[in-house]
Amino acid sequence: MATPYVTDESGKYIAATQRPDGSWRKPRRVRDGYVPQEEVPVYENKFVKFFKSKPELPPGVCVETPPQTQTQPSDAAGLSRTAKRNMKRKEKRRQQGQETKSEPELQPEPELQPEPEPQGLSQQMQQLELSASQGPGAADSARRLKNLRKKLRQVEELQQRVLSGELKPSQEQLDKLGRAQALREELQQLEAHS
């Protein structure tokens, strides 16, 4: 965007402009030789200047558009060797896939095998159901026993600390001590069942 300069008898000015919010900027006096920041050319080192001055096409090539040949070679020109090989492999697979689709193969029908006896299957299913019902229940009761023993051990430790005067029990701890008998009974019941 070029800055609008106004020149009158007292010198050169940047004209007053309106801001986006509607307020006005004051006109500013500009000294002779001042170049606004937007119009200052960007610094370019030698390397950048060299490549900008260098022609894009090799010498002897016409600037007019060259006649286009097949699209695949132009695509492959920028690819590495492995990429080219991969493209060839994909093309071969496509061609082979098209050939197999065009020539449907006749596959022999699988021979029917005699079905197993239904009684054997029902017996196997019953055994599976029995083992499944015993498995998780046994593990569940073992886990429950372990947890009850742990809770009972914690209650006994708490009781010893209270009796020795080391700890003044809170309401929650007193409730825990009151549940000790119920924990012992539940532990005895589980041990009797397992």
From Swiss-Prot:
Localization, per the record, is: Cytoplasm; Nucleus, Nucleolus; Nucleus, Nucleoplasm
**Ranges where the record places region Disordered:** 1-33, 54-140
* Signal peptide bounds: none
A Gene Ontology biological process term: positive regulation of translation
Q: Where is the composition biased (Basic and acidic residues)?
A: 94-104
Query: What are the GO cellular component annotations?
Result: cytoplasm; exon-exon junction complex; nucleolus; nucleoplasm
Sequence ranges of Basic residues compositional bias = 82-93
What is the top-level taxon of the source organism? Eukaryota
Q: Which residues form a coiled coil?
A: 137-192
Q: Which SUPFAM superfamilies match?
A: Pym (Within the bgcn gene intron protein, WIBG), N-terminal domain
Q: Provide the disulphide bond pattern.
A: none
The family database entries (SMART domains) matched by this protein are listed as: Mago-bind (SM01273)
What are the UniProt keywords, alphabetically?
A: Coiled coil, Cytoplasm, Nonsense-mediated mRNA decay, Nucleus, Translation regulation
In the record, what terms sit under GO molecular function?
A: ribosome binding; RNA binding
Give me the stretches of Polar residues compositional bias.
Answer: 120-134
| One protein family per Pfam | Mago-bind
How does the record describe its quaternary structure?
Interacts (via N-terminus) with magoh and rbm8a; the interaction is direct. Associates (eIF2A-like region) with the 40S ribosomal subunit and the 48S preinitiation complex.
This chain's function reads: Key regulator of the exon junction complex (EJC), a multiprotein complex that associates immediately upstream of the exon-exon junction on mRNAs and serves as a positional landmark for the intron exon structure of genes and directs post-transcriptional processes in the cytoplasm such as mRNA export, nonsense-mediated mRNA decay (NMD) or translation. Acts as an EJC disassembly factor, allowing translation-dependent EJC removal and recycling by disrupting mature EJC from spliced mRNAs.
Regarding protein family, the annotation reads:
Belongs to the pym family.
Name of the molecule in the record: Partner of Y14 and mago
Q: Which organism is it from?
A: Danio rerio
Taxonomy of origin reads: Eukaryota, Metazoa, Chordata, Craniata, Vertebrata
